[in-house]
Amino acid sequence: FIFDEWVEGDRVNCHRNDNYWGDKPSYTNLTVRFIADASTRFIELETGGVDACDNISGSNYSRMLNGVDGCVLYDTLSTKTFYIVCNDEHDVVSNVNVRKALAYALDLPAIVKAAYGDSATVADSSVAATLPFYEFQAQYYAYDPELAKECLTEAGYPDGLDLTLVLEEVTELVNLAEAAQSYWKAVGINVEIKVYDIATAGTMCNTGEAYFTIRNCGCASGDPS
C-alpha cells in the first residue's frame, strides 16, 4: 500500500500499490484507525465500523470464543510483555524494600486472570515466550502480603505510604493497574492512578517526574534489537 494521509490521533489512509510485485489485495483503499479504548474498538467491530481489529480485551476475547455474529476470531500468539518500571532515583521507590513490597503484594496469576481471562500468562522473562530466542530467566515474586508489610516496615514505612502510578491512556495498562491497586492497598500502599495521553505520560516517565509506571514491550519483527 502507498501512504496518502495521516490524521494525527485518528487514522492513516493508504491506497493499493498496483505495481507491487506480489499478489494484489482485493480492496483498493486501506484506512488504519487509532482507537485507544479496547471496548470502543470491539463495538466498532461488532457494528461494522471497522473490518478488523487487534488487541481485544480479555472479556471480549471470551465472547469471541463463544461466537459473535458476523465476526471471526484469528487467535495468534502475542510477542508483547507488560512490566512495572520504578524510578530508582526517586526518594521512595529507590528503596529496594519498597520495590520488594510492591512485588510481594501482587498475586500475579490472579491479576492476569482478572485483566485478561485465559488470553495471557504470567511472564518469567523480559522476552515473550512466543519468540524463538526466549529463555527462562527468573521466577516472579510469590504472592506474600505479610512479607510485603515486613518490607515496608524495614524500608521505614510501618504505617504504609502513598504513591502515584502514571499511565499512558491504553486500556490494557489501566486494566492491569486497577487489578493491582487493591492488592497494594491491602498491604498499606495507597496507589493513585493517573492516566495521561501517551506523549505526556512518556515525558513524565523519561524526566523522572513519575514514581513508577507500567509499560509494555512488543517485538512484532521477532528481532530483540
Task: For each feature predicted by the language model, list its residue ranges.
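Short, well-ordered beta-strand elements
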Residues: 1-4, 12-13, 28-34, 160-169, ...
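Structural transition elements
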Residues: 121-154, 171-175
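Gly/Pro-rich hinge or "lid" segments in bacterial periplasmic/extracellular proteins
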Residues: 1-25, 29, 146, 150
